[in-house]
């Protein structure tokens, strides 16, 4: 799966924060149907990646701290620790026994080209566009 549950939950958390207000983890979890323990884990990553700001205490909560127009789906996936790779041989440093024995692998070359196109597409999609949608969900030309 290219978009994992963790990325999906991160997107849901950001969707709640679109209004610019502070929200509690409990509120976000309930609204977006995210288990509390996952919400806390993901918020730690989003905070470390400077996408959200977390404040503690009686007046605490979570708020958006990034420009959603300048942050891409690819960026978000990196923050949560995912690359969205098509297959294991796309991983940096992957050692392929088949290539070691036979040389150039046409399958790898084709998959690498697809991986590059996918990465470019994910970089081209701003989080704001992804989270707010459009009038026609089938139209991805503006993504």
Task: Enumerate the predicted regions with their spans.
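Beta-hairpin "wing" of winged helix-turn-helix
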Residues: 49-65
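N-terminal helix-turn-helix DNA-binding core of bacterial DNA-binding proteins
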Residues: 3-34
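Basic amphipathic alpha-helical segments that dock to polyanions
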Residues: 28, 42-49
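Key DNA-contact positions within bacterial/archaeal DNA-binding proteins
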Residues: 37
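Non-DNA-binding regulatory cores of transcription-related proteins
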Residues: 65-143
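Solvent-exposed interaction patches of small proteins and small membrane subunits
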Residues: 25, 31, 56, 65, ...
